[in-house]
């Protein structure tokens, strides 16, 4: 994004609309700090500039990665899906991605107003990668990895920024305590925030094994969830859904 200095009247109406505070007054002009801007297009789509001075620019790699992770209308070329992640567990009764005894994790790194660099995204991915997890192959962050066994990202995008990015992986129930431990440790080494979602299949007696495990290892959690109600076709005959 850029602001056309010849059209801009310095009315400052656009400044509050940037979630990353990237629109700033500098040398008696209103400019976009390109280091802070995540190319989300919010300033443009807000349509608050009276002279249409806010302009969208053509993005080249690796800067283009900012837009697909931050703009609500951009889509990933590989998956043709907009957004930062996949359907996760929400379509499990159709996809069968998550099986009995497995736990899916969704690490939502960064937030609008805070943002994240892909360096911090990689730090978290590398930390959980050491445990031996299976990164979701259709996840946009996974598609940026050069080594999916470790979680290492491409070197040329590590200093790029985004509102947020979601790391998705699954592992066995037995490795959940180790995942919790490494996430607590890596949280001290990054310069952003992240939230953790986790999911498992429901047992035949209606219990949720993951919640019982969290209680045993004293992990604070909110049990509000997204439940498959069985309206989709059953992909895994004999598996709990």
Regions found by a protein language model. Name each.
Residues 2-3, 9, 13-34, 38-62:
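Iron-sulfur cluster-binding cysteine motifs and their immediate structural context
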Residues 9, 66-101, 125-129, 159, ...:
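Long, contiguous binding/interaction regions
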Residues 109-111, 169-173:
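Short beta-strand-to-loop capping motifs
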Residues 161-167:
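Flexible loop/N-cap segments at domain edges
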